[in-house]
C-alpha cells in the first residue's frame, strides 16, 4: 500500500521535474491532491507547486506575489518550528498523531494560500480592470499604505477593497 502511494507521489514529482504546467487552480489538481494519501507527500507537492505559481505570478504582480510568498514562508516556518519543538508529552505515545496534526494544519494553511491566490487572480474582473492594470493598482495601494498617506476613499465591494482614485490611475 505504501509503495503504491509512493508511486503516485513519483508521478506527480515527474510532472514537476518535466516542467509541465499544471493548473493548480483547476479541479484536476484538487483531485490529484486528494488522491495522495501520504500527508507529508501531499504537503511537499503543494508547497513546491505554490512556490512555482508564486514565482510565475510575480512576473506580473510582484506586490501580490510577495504577500503570498511571505504567507507561505510563515506557514513553512511554523510547520518546522512545531515539528522541532514537540513537547516531551507530545513526543511520547502521541508523537505520530501530533506530527500528523502538524502536517494537516500546514496543509490546510497552504490550501488557504492557494485559495487566496485564486481569489486575487480573479479580483481584477470585480474591479473592472485588466490583469495588468490590477497589478499596477496593487502597487499604488501598497505604496499608499506603506507611506501612510490618504488618497481617495476605500470601499468594500464584493469582499474587495476598491479605491476609485487608485483605480482610475491604474487605467
Task: Give short role names for the model-derived ranges.
Residues 1-171:
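Catalytic cores and motor modules of nucleic-acid processing enzymes
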